Amino acid sequence: MSGTLAKIAEIEAEMARTQKNKATAHHLGLLKARLAKLRRELITPKGGGGGGPGEGFDVAKTGDARIGFVGFPSVGKSTLLSNLAGVYSEVAAYEFTTLTTVPGVIRYKGAKIQLLDLPGIIEGAKDGKGRGRQVIAVARTCNLILIVLDVLKPLGHKKIIENELEGFGIRLNSKPPNIGFKKKDKGGINLTATCPQSELDAETVKSILAEYKIHNADVTLRSDATADDLIDVVEGNRVYIPCIYVLNKIDQISIEELDIIYKVPHCVPISAHHRWNFDDLLEKIWDYLKLVRIYTKPKGQLPDYTSPVVLPYSRTTVEDFCMKIHKNLIKEFKYALVWGLSVKHNPQKVGKDHTLEDEDVIQIVKK
């Protein structure tokens, strides 16, 4: 591993020395591709020894969503977690064998949300220092990441944590690059750009792909893409996770400073100690998770509004709903009756491909 780390340090130093302009874009693109390949070696080392990157530090996924809390020691992360779990927890004592710092599962708006403390994100975690690599491997499985920062020194910590997560293939609050990429057997590199490109040209694209030993491929750039965007698509192992920056200890700043923080995107100011602004934080968590609640209505009975079936926003068809209840239900499915925003008439008869919306009511009719 030390050889890989030395190569990474070498490339990073060369990138820092290189001025960024049109003339150096090609060279920088090449360096970035080499860096990404070396980082991948760290994430998934060659050879079988020592288990996977998350070995000994994983926990069964329970509930409808998983939130990872990341932050430096002494920023108030533990206080926030225990107070959140204490106030909103459905189960106060939640048992995990390998991860003792998990306070539990909270229930909010009918959904069960698992809270995970991810300790040890320190500078150099992505380079294999401490337990940082195992922690970030678990972070990759989260539906939402909360970066907890001390309001008195937020920017330095924010940058370090973001760099660690980025280096492990986690992209915060961003969408996958709009790039079409398809390898083929022959025909060379065929590059199509549907809009003007400020950074990538044919030569840079070819050299980045050559670094991956790819000499035949169709590449379509549908937005103004960077070398990093292309590398992310070629690597194919990136995860795109929403993130909220929780600025703690607001009892130590002025009202004027608080007003400024409120205008920063993706930020929620709180005081974990005094439990200030927890409602705002939970509402933002709910918005970012984009969960969809579906209520069930047994035939001849009133809908059950106490325990919704909770679906991720990307999988909300009637078939997805059936699979969440029981995989055999779809085999017996005839049609469904739906009440709510997803239909024009209440109730409306729909098939398994119908897309449901939050707080719809559904009744399944079997064959």
From Swiss-Prot:
Q: What is its main location?
A: nucleus
Highest taxon of the source?
A: Eukaryota
Pfam families, sorted? MMR_HSR1, MMR_HSR1_Xtn, TGS
- Region of interest (Required for interaction with STK16), residue spans: 2-16
In the record, Phosphothreonine modifications are located at: 100
Q: How is it modified after translation?
A: Polyubiquitinated; this modification induces proteolytic degradation and is impaired by interaction with ZC3H15. Sumoylated by UBE2I in response to MEKK1-mediated stimuli.
Q: Which InterPro entries match?
A: Beta-grasp_dom_sf, DRG, G_OBG, GTP-bd, GTP-binding_2, GTP1-OBG_CS, P-loop_NTPase, Small_GTP-bd
Recorded catalytic reaction(s): these are:
GTP + H2O = GDP + phosphate + H(+)
**Known regulation of activity:** The GTPase activity is enhanced by potassium ions as well as by DFRP1 binding.
Q: List cystine links.
A: none
Q: What are the (3S)-3-hydroxylysine sites (modified residues) in this protein?
A: 22
Residues holding Mg(2+): 78, 98
**Any idea which residues bear N-acetylserine here?**
2
Query: Which EC number(s) are documented for this chain?
Result: 3.6.5.-
User: Does Mitochondrion count among this protein's keywords?
Assistant: no
UniProt note on tissues of expression? Fairly high levels in liver, heart, kidney, testis and brain. Very low levels in lung, spleen, and skeletal muscle.
Which compartment or compartments is the protein found in? Answer: Nucleus; Cytoplasm
PROSITE patterns, per the entry:
G_OBG, GTP1_OBG, TGS
Q: Where is the TGS domain?
A: 290-366
> What is the UniProt domain comment for this protein?
Its C-terminal domain interacts with TAL1. The ThrRS, GTPase, SpoT (TGS) domain is not necessary for GTP binding nor for the GTPase activity. It appears to play a regulatory role favoring GTP hydrolysis mediated by DFRP1/ZC3H15.
> So what does this one do?
Catalyzes the conversion of GTP to GDP through hydrolysis of the gamma-phosphate bond in GTP. Appears to have an intrinsic GTPase activity that is stimulated by ZC3H15/DFRP1 binding likely by increasing the affinity for the potassium ions. Binds to microtubules and promotes microtubule polymerization and bundling that are required for mitotic spindle assembly during prophase to anaphase transition. GTPase activity is not necessary for these microtubule-related functions.
Complexes and interactors: Interacts (via its C-terminal) with TAL1. Interacts with DFRP1/ZC3H15; this interaction prevents DRG1 poly-ubiquitination and degradation by proteasome. DRG1-DFRP1/ZC3H15 complex co-sediments with polysomes. Interacts with STK16. Interacts with JMJD7.
Family named by the database record: Belongs to the TRAFAC class OBG-HflX-like GTPase superfamily. OBG GTPase family.
Q: What is this protein called?
A: Developmentally-regulated GTP-binding protein 1
Q: Which organism is it from?
A: Mus musculus (Mouse)
Whichever gene encodes this chain, its name is Drg1
